[in-house]
């Protein structure tokens, strides 16, 4: 399946670095959204239109991801996408006109999607070699990266440091990190079976898994792009304070993911997801309808903690289905998830024009509640029908002595 690897720890660290990079650069864009909305005098609807740039770019990247992995391998694609993403983040953040922001988001969405697909294939490979559940911890580093990006950006905004300086620091640092990551990642020869233009979309046993990923990541995208604006609209806070809900959302998500593997071992995958999504529903209701800063922050923290393990668990399950290949299964699941991540904020912007932003958040909350029903119904049935040997989140073989730990 793959070439021999001498040192597992540096490889796992490289995959962690890829997830951290993607999360940090995402947080770097997100922290500037309220500022850009104010500087460019955008309405909720106009901002929603601009965010279509990221959605279109993401969808294009998802369509290209599977054949590009087949052509170049997940290692090369991951390295190249990380370098380019660190460079193009400047365009949406620093552009002086709405249409340039839109164009920048096209590029950002495209390369973010390529990085996400390729790093997830790498993570699935490392998890398989290690013969233990690691996907939640990998995604935990994405959340830590996002939290770090939002916190660092919010601090610089508070200190009134120029966005140009902010972006220069981020670009220089993460281009360096991306080059090191590229050097350390392993070749996965199974990648080469993904030849030709093959659009990855979840069908059969992957369909309910992909649906819950869609709902979970849609909610994550809405919180990322609109939580700060909701806080500014309802409580009139400044730009730095507006970054607080998403920062707490991310750190709560990171905590959930770092303890998620142990929670799954103790309580089971489906119970973990169902209880988590239910917690997210309660948190979103608090954040939306209780107009107090502390309660809003706590509510978004509950939402982050509750959503934290849904996507990692389901992506790990999809990778173990592996039909027709691991890369295809992961790409198919990630595709619909990231469609939710990037189209959710766009749709909420349009919906907010019609029914007001708090009510639009209520629609999102209803979607999360629907996810609970799907987990307890079709997905649980799928796990039982497919059998533990294919859908189990843990390899039944004993862990080797030269594991990634």
Predicted region positions:
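Short amphipathic helix-loop junctions that connect adjacent transmembrane helices
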Residues: 31-45, 225-241
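Helix-to-loop junctions at the C-terminal end of transmembrane segments
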Residues: 61-74, 157, 256-268, 352-353
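Pair of pore-lining "gating" transmembrane helices in MFS-fold secondary transporters
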Residues: 8-32, 106-107, 203-219, 301-305
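Primarily marks hydrophobic transmembrane alpha-helices of the MFS/SLC 12-helix fold
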Residues: 75-78, 273
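Helix-loop-helix hairpin linking two adjacent transmembrane segments in secondary transporters
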Residues: 100, 137-186
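Helix-breaking motifs and short loop linkers at transmembrane-helix boundaries and internal kinks
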Residues: 41, 73, 94-99, 236, ...
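Cytoplasmic helix-loop-helix junction between adjacent transmembrane helices
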Residues: 104-140
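C-terminal transmembrane helical hairpin of 12-TM major facilitator-type secondary transporters
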Residues: 267-314
């Amino acid at each position: 399946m793959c070439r021999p690897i001498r040192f597992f720890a540096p490889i796992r660290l490289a995959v962690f670095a890829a997830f951290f990079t993607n999360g940090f650069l995402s947080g770097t864009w997100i922290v500037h959204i309220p500022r850009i909305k104010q500087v460019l005098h955008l309405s909720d609807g106009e901002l929603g239109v601009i965010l279509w740039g990221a959605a279109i770019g993401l969808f294009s990247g998802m369509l290209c991801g599977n054949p590009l992995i087949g052509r170049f391998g997940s290692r090369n694609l991951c390295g190249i996408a990380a370098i380019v993403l660190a460079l193009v983040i400047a365009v949406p953040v620093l552009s002086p006109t709405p249409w340039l922001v839109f164009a920048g988001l096209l590029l950002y969405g495209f390369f973010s999607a390529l990085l996400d697909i390729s790093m997830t294939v790498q993570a699935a490979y490392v998890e398989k070699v290690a013969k233990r559940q690691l996907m939640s911890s990998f995604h935990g580093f994405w959340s830590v990266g996002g939290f770090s990006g939002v916190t660092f950006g919010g601090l610089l905004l508070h200190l009134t440091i120029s966005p140009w300086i902010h972006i220069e620091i981020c670009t220089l640092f993460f281009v360096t990190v991306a080059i090191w990551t590229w050097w350390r990642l392993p070749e996965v020869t199974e990648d080469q079976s993904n030849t030709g233009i093959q659009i990855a979309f979840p069908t059969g046993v992957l369909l309910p898994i992909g649906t819950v990923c869609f709902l979970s990541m849609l909610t994550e995208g809405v919180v990322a792009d609109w939580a700060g604006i909701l806080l500014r609209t309802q409580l009139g806070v400044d730009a730095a304070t507006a970054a607080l809900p998403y920062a707490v959302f991310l750190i709560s998500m990171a905590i959930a993911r770092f303890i998620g593997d142990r929670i799954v071992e103790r309580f089971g995958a489906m119970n973990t997801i169902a209880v988590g999504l239910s917690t997210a529903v309660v948190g979103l209701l608090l954040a939306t309808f209780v107009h107090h800063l502390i309660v809003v922050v706590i509510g978004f923290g509950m939402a982050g903690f509750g959503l934290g393990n849904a996507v990692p668990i389901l992506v790990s399950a999809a990778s173990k289905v592996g039909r027709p290949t691991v890369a295809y299964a992961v790409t198919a699941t990630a595709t619909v998830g990231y469609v939710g991540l990037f189209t959710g904020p766009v749709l909420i912007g349009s919906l907010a024009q019609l029914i007001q932003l708090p009510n639009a958040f209520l629609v999102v909350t209803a979607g999360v509640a629907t996810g609970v029903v799907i987990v307890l119904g079709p997905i649980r049935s799928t796990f039982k029908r497919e059998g533990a040997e294919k859908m189990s989140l843990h390899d039944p073989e004993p862990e080797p002595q030269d594991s990634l730990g």
